């Protein structure tokens, strides 16, 4: 059996890349309560890792810096739910499996960790079980797991609209040197939406007259002001990123993770090191996002 804590020791491995909301516009709300969003999304080269191995009986193990946070999650974990839904869809091909989740990203932090894990579970299990679902069926299954899971299946730059199910690739979005920063203080997504003052905001437009950085800067995250009210550390962490030379700093998703875009990876690594020295109790990670051409 592979050593616990090392997802790479398993026969099949998958990356669960951090999902970064470069922009998030809340444009309305459906009668069922779901909010309508316009999002510009990219993915980082850091994230969780999952390993998969045939087993006598289903097993799920955890490791990583934030693994203990999920230890009591049990059957509610999205990875387990993804396994069970996919097994229902493929039937007898789905033999028992040991899944190991190396949890490197903060939990409930606005960078799609659980959704990315679920998407990686679907990809890895289809490889292990030697099966594929039709594109439409896989998209439907992914949406059952959560609004962010379909885009995490893509794990490439995209625009997502609706509740996240309307996906359009953005092939010309470049890679960015970035620092992810999180004060390791939980943010309640329902509370952030409750604090949101306007739910019918202007949609996302991408007029690239002055380059991608200016285009992203002209967009916004409508959830950042209410999240800052709930967690004041978000404002502090954004200011710290800017003080370290970030060309743009913004919150991702419903928080509390913020990202800073830097001129290059050397600047990002230097900033992450300085920030970690200033606040060793917080989370800082230098990373590079994927490009649209991948």
UniProtKB/Swiss-Prot annotation:
Q: Which reaction does it catalyse?
A: 4-CDP-2-C-methyl-D-erythritol + ATP = 4-CDP-2-C-methyl-D-erythritol 2-phosphate + ADP + H(+)
Q: Does the keyword Transferase apply?
A: yes
Write out the entry's keywords from A to Z.
Answer: ATP-binding, Isoprene biosynthesis, Kinase, Nucleotide-binding, Transferase
Q: Where, by residue number, is the active site?
A: 19, 148
> Which Pfam family would be a valid example here?
GHMP_kinases_C
Q: In which pathway does it act?
A: Isoprenoid biosynthesis; isopentenyl diphosphate biosynthesis via DXP pathway; isopentenyl diphosphate from 1-deoxy-D-xylulose 5-phosphate: step 3/6
The family database entries (Gene3D superfamilies) matched by this protein are listed as: 3.30.230.10, GHMP kinase, C-terminal domain
Q: What is its EC number?
A: 2.7.1.148
Which positions does UniProt annotate for ATP binding? 106-116
Which InterPro entries does UniProt cross-reference here? Answer: GHMP_kinase_C_dom, GHMP_kinase_C_sf, GHMP_kinase_N_dom, IspE, Ribosomal_Su5_D2-typ_SF, Ribsml_uS5_D2-typ_fold_subgr
Q: Which GO terms describe its molecular function?
A: 4-(cytidine 5'-diphospho)-2-C-methyl-D-erythritol kinase activity; ATP binding
Q: Name one GO biological process term.
A: isopentenyl diphosphate biosynthetic process, methylerythritol 4-phosphate pathway
Functional description taken from the UniProt entry = Catalyzes the phosphorylation of the position 2 hydroxy group of 4-diphosphocytidyl-2C-methyl-D-erythritol.
Similarity annotation: Belongs to the GHMP kinase family. IspE subfamily.
| Protein name, per record | 4-diphosphocytidyl-2-C-methyl-D-erythritol kinase
- The record lists the organism as Rhizobium etli (strain ATCC 51251 / DSM 11541 / JCM 21823 / NBRC 15573 / CFN 42)
Question: According to the entry, what is the taxonomic lineage of the organism?
Answer: Bacteria, Pseudomonadati, Pseudomonadota, Alphaproteobacteria, Hyphomicrobiales
The protein's gene is named: ispE
């Amino acid at each position: 059996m592979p050593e616990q804590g090392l997802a790479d020791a398993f026969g099949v491995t998958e990356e669960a890349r951090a999902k970064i909301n470069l922009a998030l516009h809340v444009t309305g709300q459906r009668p069922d309560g779901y909010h309508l969003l316009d999002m510009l999304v990219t993915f980082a080269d850091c994230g969780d890792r999952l390993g998969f191995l045939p087993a006598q009986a289903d097993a799920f193990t955890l490791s990583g810096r934030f693994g203990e946070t999920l230890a009591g999650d049990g059957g509610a974990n999205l990875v387990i739910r993804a396994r069970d839904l996919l097994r229902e869809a493929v039937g007898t091909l789905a033999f028992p499996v040991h899944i190991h989740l190396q949890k490197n990203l903060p939990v409930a932090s606005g960078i799609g960790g659980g959704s990315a894990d679920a998407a990686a579970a679907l990809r890895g299990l289809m490889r292990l079980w030697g099966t594929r679902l039709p594109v439409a069926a896989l998209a439907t299954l992914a949406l059952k797991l959560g609004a962010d899971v379909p885009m995490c299946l893509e794990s490439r730059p995209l625009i997502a609209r609706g509740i996240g199910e309307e996906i359009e690739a953005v092939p010309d979005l470049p890679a960015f040197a970035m620092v992810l920063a999180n004060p390791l203080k939980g943010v309640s997504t329902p509370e952030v939406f409750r604090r949101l003052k306007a739910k019918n905001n202007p949609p996302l437009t991408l007029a690239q007259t002055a380059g991608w950085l200016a285009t992203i800067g002209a967009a916004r995250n409508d959830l950042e002001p209410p999240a800052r009210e709930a967690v004041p550390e978000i404002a502090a962490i954004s200011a710290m990123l800017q003080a370290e030379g970030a060309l743009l700093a913004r919150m991702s998703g419903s928080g509390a993770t913020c990202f800073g875009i830097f001129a290059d990876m050397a600047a990002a690594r230097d900033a992450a090191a300085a920030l970690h020295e200033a606040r060793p109790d917080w989370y800082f990670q230098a990373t590079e996002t994927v490009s649209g051409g991948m």
